[in-house]
Amino acid sequence: YELLRNVIPEEFRKTVAGICVDATSLTMVLLAEDGRALSELDGWSEAAHARVKLWNYQRAQVNADVALNLARNLQVAVLGRTGGSISCEWMLPKLLEVRDEAPEIYSKIDLAMDLCEFLTFRLTGQLVRSIGSLSYKCLGAEDLSFPERTFLNGLRAGFYEEYCHFLLGDVRKPGECAGVLRSELTKRWGLPEQIPVATGMLDGHTSLA
């Protein structure tokens, strides 16, 4: 919040017409039921698996390998959209790592978001998913469907239901409005009311827009 306030010179604040956030993907943020990141909960700021996992976090490679082998054996259709791969830097392997290594943290997850989605959520208060992230590095689709139940439950029992819940939200495309800037933020930053905030984008997609 403070960074954005400092980035926009005061003389330009009244001319801001819209906001869009992009971030390197997939940077995973886990949320509790009250909308806070798990790392914001009391006593969890230093818990490794509650903290943001940056896009280049690669400790979940074993999970990625197992998921890819199973997806190939089952001929899961989503591989046609991912170039036939599942990276350890994506949502699914990272979530499996938390599930296996920190069940007490995993049990507190309500939602899992890519950073561009999380920041947009914080700006607007609206739970909006970016189709760019969801359909690629979360292995989902625009209609919020995910790989076959057999595939996800083949990785861990009950994982299909968990994964679908973690990625709930209103799916929108780049350029579509996710909501308007929250009133308390317009006051804090000295910006006009009702500024539209676009759906979050992946940084690589932004460079092509």
What do these predicted ranges mean?
Residues E2-A209:
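Glycine-rich phosphate-binding/catalytic subdomain of phosphoryl-transfer
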